[in-house]
Amino acid sequence: MLLRALNTPITDWQGRRVWLIGASTGIGAALACALASRGAKLALSARSSDKLAALADACPEALLLPLDITRREAVAAAHERLLAHWGGIDLVVFNAGTYRPLRAWELDAAAIRETLAVNLIGPMDGVATVLPAMLERGAGAIALVGSVAGYRGLPRAITYGSSKAALIHFAETLYLDLAPRGISVFVINPGFVATPLTAQNDFRMPALISADTAAGEILAGLARGEFEIHFPKRFTRVMKALQCLPRRLYFSLIRKLTGL
């Protein structure tokens, strides 16, 4: 019983209706290409219509729906369009995100609000938008892209890590409420992935992987029906072990490892 998949495994993508929000670059673009190659019916959303259009060759049948995840009315309008076009949505992936490496003394109101709006409030509003139709059908899946930065406090992740920690909590609570109603909930917690966002980092990123590798890990986790899909394991397992340390030891170790 303990080994039973927590979610319904997704193994056959042919004709599966997937709305990917945050599809223009990095993990989102790589996942869009991987899903298109497996026959999924795609709707791709991001703020940049130009970057979405650049995916047209890899995803020629995809519906392109430019939007800003922080604008609830835009998400709702796109959702209504998809319901009218498809009749339902099988999986919504909330991948839109923003990141600024900040120390505590660099905090400002604009950075706080932007990060929370994109990384947390936008996905929460998005779930509130898509959920009623899924509940009416008694089927569907929601995937939220978090981060291992949400496991515990880390230097330079004061806003980003906080938003991802809250998103992980949100995903866990969603699962408890929705699994009995036939809705699958996945939380995807990557380590370091080579993307335009992580290109801002001026420090060595352990176990750095490509966006294509990340997309493959996500598909493998969905196929296993895992609640939490975390990768690369050689890094994320270490981060999970650090969750068990008492704070005195954790703080000391992180200072030594980061040199901060």
State where each predicted segment sits:
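Active-site helix of classical SDR
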Residues: 127, 163
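Conserved glycine-rich Rossmann-like NAD(P)H-binding loop of the short-chain dehydrogenase/reductase
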Residues: 38-55
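Residue(s) in the substrate-gating loop at a strand-loop-helix junction
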Residues: 147
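Substrate-binding pocket helix/loop in short-chain dehydrogenase/reductase
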Residues: 103-105, 111-116
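Rossmann-fold cofactor-recognition segment
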Residues: 59-73
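C-terminal helical subdomain
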Residues: 187, 203-238
